[in-house]
Amino acid sequence: MQKLKVGDTIQVMAGAEASEKNPATKRGKVLKIDREAERVTVEGLRLVKRHMKKTPQSPEGGIVEKPGTIALANVQVVCAKCDKPTRVGIRTEGEEGKKKRFCKNCDALID
């Protein structure tokens, strides 16, 4: 079981995108995870500009902003209950032994 999934709300903790004055502004939803490169793409963060050529698939060329990638080690999952960035733990629950993710700060289930 993975500790970070697509659709999770995360906060950037370190790197160029981290904000020391107001860390809550650097939050977003995970769009894509590249496990081999250990990078994550987050909605609205680390926007990079790409110069696109006009093609039949994209008739409008020009400069387009796309989300870039952030190192997986620089982000943490935000708990929905305590609204803080947290480490994620995994435990088995119920008779079937299903694995569930939980917040290590407040012990609430993440999914």
UniProtKB/Swiss-Prot annotation:
Q: Which UniProt keywords apply?
A: Ribonucleoprotein, Ribosomal protein, RNA-binding, rRNA-binding
Which protein, by its recorded name, is this? Large ribosomal subunit protein uL24
Does the record bear Metal-binding in its keywords? no
Entries under Gene3D superfamilies matching the protein: 2.30.30.30
InterPro entries membership: Rib_uL2_dom2 (IPR014722), Ribosomal_uL24 (IPR003256), Ribosomal_uL24_KOW (IPR041988), Translation_prot_SH3-like_sf (IPR008991)
Does the keyword Oxidoreductase feature in the UniProt annotation?
no
Question: Its gene?
Answer: rplX
Q: Its family?
A: Belongs to the universal ribosomal protein uL24 family.
Role: One of two assembly initiator proteins, it binds directly to the 5'-end of the 23S rRNA, where it nucleates assembly of the 50S subunit.
The source organism is Myxococcus xanthus (strain DK1622)
